[in-house]
Amino acid sequence: MRDYGKVSPQFWIGATGKELRSAGMEAQIVAMYLMTSPHANMLGLYYMPKLYIAHETGLGEKGASKGLARAIEAGFCAYDEASEMVWVFEMARYQIADQLKPDDKRCVGIQNEYNALPANPHLEPFFDKYEASFNLTRKRQESSKTASPIEAPSKPHRSQEQEQEQEQDKNTSSARADMPAGFVRFW
């Protein structure tokens, strides 16, 4: 959890702030919560189930969903239902800086934080937006693609196969030596 976060006065009077205000009270509350949430990070890209928003703002599920939808419509953030990841578009710029020099040690910290994020569809757009500003070096792609149920597991290397067969033969022969003559295993 962060110790502090920066909120610009532009939140209330900037173009996005005005959009949020016209979208309603829930949108403003959700937007402010997303910037100051104890679950947030400096990137503005983090895990945020809607239930957290509902509970911690007191808006309830309906109010939180409405506020989040309106904040998205206002261009404040994006939300992925499947991964429950939110991206507050300008948060990294406000929390970190507009631009960092390549030798700034924060660049490594930002890259590490980015690398540690779970797979989600905001990874590539985040990198594209902040690559130059924060000297990011490694772009991640959403890797939530799983193998098709039709696909068979990959075949082991020949040496692995031989080792497994030898191990099975050894276990089977030692188990047989312990059994009395004429004993038939039924399980």
What is the predicted function of each stretch?
Residues 3, 62, 97-187:
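Charged low-complexity intrinsically disordered patches
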Residues 14-15, 52, 179-182:
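Short, flexible active-site loops
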